[in-house]
Amino acid sequence: PNGQQMDFMDDLFAGSPELECLYSRDKDSLHFVEKHPQALESLRSNMKDRKVIIHNEDSYKALCALTPPLIKRGLVLCDPSYEDADDYKKVCDALKTVRKKWNTAIIALWYPLLLRRKNETSQLLTELEDFCKLGTTPCESFKVELVTKNPEETKTESGSHLYGSGMFIMNPPWKLKEDMEKNCAFINKILEIL
């Protein structure tokens, strides 16, 4: 891509890191992990004037290595690519490790809603829910999903496409579940109009 196309792609890529920067305080420490070279370049470009630390390595290993931080309470936001079926198992294992090492952390996991990955998603959520209830450091947890299409309508000859997104939250702060459910209901109403 040429320079103008790269600038446009950088603007589109901002995503989670941009949101984290918007809602962070000056005293907060932000760490971003990216392994893929093109995404790493976009991340560095978007964050060049920010006080952030960018790690170029496997996110699951980095997540475990960076915890626990010096602060007592914090947020881990994990939004894997889920390109490989084993990403579901890797993220599950990593989040359980983080929870054991840093039991005061709020852990938020994004996951895609895809027909072709329905079993992997179900297994991931069941394992995390069981861990939160029965693990060495039990905590509250919940999931919230935003369905934007009928799953059956996403089927194509090349497979199925994204029909929504979900978030699984471990150790949520007070009222987060209610707030997220209200926001998802509001977004769904808007999408029905469009």
Walk through the language-model features, giving the residues of each.
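Class I S-adenosyl-L-methionine-dependent methyltransferase catalytic core
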Residues: 1-194
